[in-house]
Amino acid sequence: MYPDNFYSSTFTLLAEAEVGKHFYWDIAGFLVHGQVLVVVWFVLALLLLFAVLGTRDIDRIPNSWQNFAESAVDFVTDIARDQLGESFYREWVPFIGTLFLFIFGCNWAGAIIPWKLIELPEGELAAPTNDINTTVALALLTSLAYFYAGLSKKGFGYFKRYIQPIPLLLPINILEDFTKPLSLSFRLFGNVLADELTITVLTSLVPLVIPLPIMALGIFAGSVQALIFSTLAAAYIAEALE
C-alpha cells in the first residue's frame, strides 16, 4: 500500500504542472500569466491597426487595405450565415468575427514571430492560445453566448431542451453543455501547443532546414483551428436558437 502523502503529493504535482516557462503578475491578489497578456496586447494592437488602415479612407474603388478589411468581414459573415441562417446571422457576426480574428492573430503570432529568441529575465513569450487559460476563457465565452442566444429567444422555455426527446436523457443533455467548452478549449490548446513543441524540438536538432516547412504547416494549421473554433461556436449558437 502506498502512503496517503504519496497520493496527495502526486495530485499536487499534477495540479501545478505547467507548459513552458511563465512569468507572473500580481493583479488584485491574483497571479496571472504575464506573457499571455503581453502577446495578447500585441495581437490586439495589430488587429486594431489593420482595422484603422482598412476603414480610414473608404472609397467606392477600394485600396489594398480596404480590400483586406472587406475580405475579412465577408469571410466571417459567410461563417455566421452558413451556420445561423439568414434570420439570425447579422447580430452574431461581431461575436463570431471577433473570435475568428483573435484566434487567427494569436495563432499566426505564435507561428511566425520567433518569441523564444526574445530573452526575458524570467519566463518566455509564446502564442496566447498555447496557454490553456486562454482557450478555456474563449470556450466559456462561447458557452455564455449560446446560453444567451437560447434564453433571449425562448426565455425559460429554453431549458425544455434538456428533457427532449425524453426526460431520461436529462443527464446526457446536461453533460453535453460541459463537453462542448472542454472540446473547444482542448482542441485549440492541443493543436497550437503541439505545433510549437514540434518547431522547438526540430529547431534544436536541425536549425533552419526542417523548421521552415513545419512553420508553414503551423501557419496553415493555425488558420484552420481559428476557422474550426469560430464555426463550431456559430453552430452551437444556431443549435440554441432552434
Swiss-Prot record:
Domain of life: Eukaryota
InterPro entries associated with the record: ATP_syn_F0_a_bact/chloroplast, ATP_synth_F0_asu, ATP_synth_F0_asu_AS, F0_ATP_A_sf
Gene3D superfamilies xref list: ATP synthase, F0 complex, subunit A (1.20.120.220)
Topology term for the membrane: Multi-pass membrane protein
Chief localization: plastid
GO cellular component: chloroplast thylakoid membrane; plasma membrane; proton-transporting ATP synthase complex
Coiled coil spans: none
Transmembrane segments: 34-54, 93-113, 132-152, 188-210, 222-242
Keywords: ATP synthesis, CF(0), Chloroplast, Hydrogen ion transport, Ion transport, Membrane, Plastid, Thylakoid, Transmembrane, Transmembrane helix, Transport
Annotated localization: Plastid, Chloroplast thylakoid membrane
Molecular function as annotated in GO: proton-transporting ATP synthase activity, rotational mechanism
CDD domains reported for this sequence: ATP-synt_Fo_a_6
HAMAP family in the cross-refs: ATP_synth_a_bact
Function comment: Key component of the proton channel; it plays a direct role in the translocation of protons across the membrane.
Record text on subunit structure and interactions: F-type ATPases have 2 components, CF(1) - the catalytic core - and CF(0) - the membrane proton channel. CF(1) has five subunits: alpha(3), beta(3), gamma(1), delta(1), epsilon(1). CF(0) has four main subunits: a, b, b' and c.
Similarity remark: Belongs to the ATPase A chain family.
Protein name: ATP synthase subunit a, chloroplastic
